[in-house]
Design a protein with these regions (language model features):
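C-terminal catalytic "cap/lid" subdomain
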Residues: 1-101, 105-271
Length: 271
């Protein structure tokens, strides 16, 4: 049994596109509804919940009946614009069925790096949380492009969720993906791969495991999650990585059930 994290009050939940979109491109409405139920329930328990959600391009492709992801950046941004609107419509419908208000916040890296706009974002988030509203955050894909000396992209929402956790002084980041946690090797290729129950330090060896030959996590996958975990560990906070196929797993994670991977720094008493 892991440490009980049910006392954590301010929680950032990040959900990836793979948990929102089926492999055939259909939107996972049942999964989104379950996520809304869980987060609304936690909010009703007095917790402060922030959702970082991917999925704009995936939902946009579904809405526009596209079978393949666009290659050109302007096309990707147009699809993201359609998808973000539709995604928020779905979220609003699902959360409203549980009497929970939500708000949309779209961010770019330069907003966070500029002190004045960073403070404005922080103020807005604090006010929404005070009002009992769940902020739903995504990168602003329609304008986020890195070119020359103007850097606006976070890289991916793994990094964004860790930055949001840092900005809001969250006590816990829960990252839901299409994997059960961090493994000692690629579980698709190695039947001996072992799931880490907890990780207390992001070492070069761990990063090598994430990017090693045969790993399915090379680009914006497990490496990105480990970098996000390092940011959380540096803050002496907690991060949980688990499979988002059934969002009710969040209840198990908070209760200390041995699912997923728990990233945290051990105290001197625990070492």
């Amino acid at each position: 049994m892991r440490a009980d994290l049910s006392n954590k009050n301010r929680i950032v939940v990040k959900i990836g596109t793979s948990s929102l979109i089926y492999p055939n491109g259909a939107i996972n409405l049942a999964g989104i509804d379950e996520l809304a139920f869980v987060l609304a329930a936690l909010q009703n328990q007095g917790k402060e919940i922030i959702l970082v959600s991917s999925g704009a391009i995936g939902v946009g492709m579904n809405k526009l009946n596209l079978k393949e992801r666009p290659v050109e950046i302007p096309q990707q941004q147009a699809v993201a614009a359609v998808g973000q609107s539709e995604l928020m419509t779905i979220y609003n419908q699902r959360f409203q069925s549980y009497s929970q208000q939500t708000a949309q916040i779209l961010l770019t890296r330069d907003i966070i790096e500029f002190p004045q706009s960073r403070q404005n974002v922080s103020n807005t988030l604090e006010q929404l949380l005070t009002m009992g509203i769940i902020p739903i955050i995504n990168e602003n894909d329609t304008v986020a492009v890195d070119e020359l000396d103007h850097l606006t992209k976070f890289g991916d929402n793994d990094q964004l969720s860790a930055i949001v956790a840092q900005l809001t002084k969250a006590e816990l980041l829960i990252m839901l993906s299409d994997i059960d946690g961090f493994y000692s090797a690629n579980p698709l290729n190695d039947p001996e791969a072992v799931l880490y129950s907890e990780i207390n330090e992001i070492t070069p060896e761990l990063l090598e495991q994430a990017t090693g030959k045969g790993s399915p996590y090379g680009t914006g996958g497990m490496t990105s999650k480990l970098k996000a975990a390092k940011r959380i560990l540096d803050l002496n906070s907690h991060m949980l990585l688990a499979n988002g196929k059934q969002p009710k797993i969040i209840f198990d994670l908070l209760a200390g059930e041995p699912v997923g991977t728990h990233f945290y720094q051990r105290t001197e008493d625990e070492q």
